[in-house]
Amino acid sequence: MRVLIVEDETMIAMTIEDALLDAGCEVVGIAGTLPEAQILIERERPAAVTLDGNLNGTLTGPVAKQLNELAIRYMVVTGYVELTLTDPLLAQAPVIQKPFTHQGLTRAAAQHFC
């Protein structure tokens, strides 16, 4: 399954990428900002997205809205669960809390995406 990673912290994005690859997913890109995410979603048309709930202090609800409109599955990977869940679009998705384990994220990706 083709998966896009939306994450503003490089090391976390790389960890997510490793877990997705171990789950059998194909990573089609990594976006670190809202505009970059929206462009990559349109260009790559991933089957699924891991979505950080908060990019550089901004909730990613607009990206979740775009994903819903395109019927693209997503799960939220965030360290700010309570803040993230205040956005109804983000609250409807599966949530993986940071810090996460490699095994936990691999299992979640396999269950929800691959």
Q: How does the language model describe each region?
A:
Residues 10-29:
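Two-component/phosphorelay signaling modules centered on CheY-like receiver
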Residues 30-48:
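Acidic, metal-coordinating helix/loop segments flanking the phosphotransfer/catalytic sites
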Residues 10, 32-36, 103:
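Acidic phosphotransfer microenvironment of two-component signaling modules
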Residues 7:
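Conserved acidic carboxylate
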Residues 75-78:
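Hydrophobic/aromatic residues positioned on beta-strands within the core alpha/beta folds
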